[in-house]
Amino acid sequence: MEIRTIGIIGQGALGVMYGNYLKKRMGNENVFFIADEGRVNRYRSADMVCNGEACGFSYRSPAEAVTADLIIFAVKFMGMESALETVKPFVGEHTLFLSVLNGISSEEMIEKAYGADHVLYACVQGMDAGKDGNEVTYKNMGYITIGNKDRSHDEKLKAVTELFDRTGLAYKVP
């Protein structure tokens, strides 16, 4: 499986940092932010800025859903339940999930909602992104430690590591 489309839910520092990075390498048509209709309207009216550059992100509400190959959760933990519901129309038979919320609770919630076969575990380290209003700044993106709960190497891990290799996103597999 090759990951060609990425949906990101959560427009905090990590969501914007990874979204901007991936959008520049894969194109705005292939990387989009997922949000409820109210947030989409708000996001479209005030463009995000990342390290001084306007992002020009693409946004999709559930009414505008397309199947994503990978969905990245970058919401605060208290927003996970709502996010799990919001992404539902974007989920297909082969959609993979990655959460950049450190700790394993979010992955367990995704597994419960969509099945363990679709979830990779991740921990972001070494980044220094911060957000103030609609501006995100960072000097160091750090890296993502990624893998399966049982430390196996399977097709879903291969698909995501190939994506990271293709885009140059720093990662480690334990």
Q: What do the predicted segments below correspond to?
A:
Residues M1-F57:
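NAD(P)+-binding Rossmann beta1-loop-alpha1 motif at the extreme N-terminus of oxidoreductases
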Residues R39-R42, E107-E108, H153-D154:
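Short, charged/polar "capping" segments at the starts of alpha-helices
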Residues R4, E29, T95, D117-H118, ...:
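A structural micro-motif
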Residues F90, A116-H118, G133-P174:
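Internal alpha-helical scaffold of NAD(P)-dependent oxidoreductase catalytic cores
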Residues G7, V31-F32, L98, T145, ...:
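A structural signal for isolated positions on well-ordered beta-strands in alpha/beta enzyme cores
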Residues G52-E135:
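Rossmann-like NAD(P)(H) cofactor-binding subdomain of soluble oxidoreductases
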Residues I9, A13, V87, K156:
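Flavin (primarily FAD) cofactor-binding/catalytic cores of flavoenzymes
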